Amino acid sequence: MKHVFIVNKISGKHKAYNIIGLIKDVSEAKHLDYEIKVTEYKNHAKEIAESYFYDDDVTLYSVGGDGTLLEIVNGMNLQTPLGVIPAGSGNDFFRFFDGNAKRDLRKIINDTIDAIPKDIDIGVCGDMRFVNTTSIGLDAIINANASRLIRNTFITKGPAYLISIIENSIALRTTHVRLFADDKEIEGDYYIIACMNGKYYGNGVMAAPSASLSDGYFDLCLFKKANRLKTYSLLLKYLKGKHEGVDGIDIIRCKHVIIDTDKMVDCQSDGENYCSEHIDISICEKALKLKIPF
């Protein structure tokens, strides 16, 4: 068995690149047949993952954040076991297993290598796989606007997201949608529509407190339009994961979601931005063999 660590060298302010020595120490202490691949450009992690096949007898490891994991999941053969070493800025997927995602990295690496793979669900949106979430609304707009600021100005990631959060929290734009959640049809104006496989997204927002990665269902969060005072109150609950059963935010368990809008809107899947007016999302039950260190 070969262990291949795919490292995003810029992830987490170079945190992933800086733990290469730690990966080597643990791997050599275990006498592993291992290889470290460092990404050089966007989608390089996907290309690296695509180069391995199930009969290669290999385990892949995502060393970075949610974006690195997204690339690998979209490139890999799903019969290949995958481990996640949280070395990004958000690590929202890993928070499902460790709420603060701040455990000792040496122990995480060691325990992930030793872990027996477990089958978990993933989502598919169009031709993109995702492990955590696909959403439209304020969260996707904030993500897209921050990314544009980073790309087109000298503003760095932290301030860019802060500016985008402030601007869009004041504007409070809604999106009019017609959606189907399995056989249920819904139409209305919403601030956020988040189709959750995991619990967390957006750097620690617990949108789906009761989500499971192996129940064969999404938790579809629908944040309805309301007056400004109520919206801010609900938003605080939403950010802290205290919104289950609260009037104004519905959570529907479903396997298939279709969302139609009357114009192109910002969307995101595990932090990857795009625009669409038609989104078709399906659950793929127990599709990914994940090595979980706990």
Across the structure, where does each feature detected by a protein language model lie?
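Glycine-rich phosphate/pyrophosphate-binding beta-alpha loops
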Residues: 135, 139, 194-208, 273
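ATP/nucleoside-binding phosphotransfer catalytic cores, i.e., glycine-rich phosphate-binding loops
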Residues: 16, 181-182, 187, 212, ...
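Gly/Ser/Thr-rich active-site loops/lids in small-molecule metabolic enzymes
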Residues: 150-160, 209-229
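Catalytic core of DAGKc-family lipid kinases
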Residues: 30, 39, 78-81, 87-191
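ATP/NTP phosphate-donor binding region
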Residues: 1-60, 184
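Short Gly/Thr/Asp-enriched flexible loops that form oxyanion-binding sites at enzyme active sites
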Residues: 68-80
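Glycine-rich beta-strand-to-loop/alpha-helix junction loops that act as flexible
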Residues: 9, 63-65, 85-88
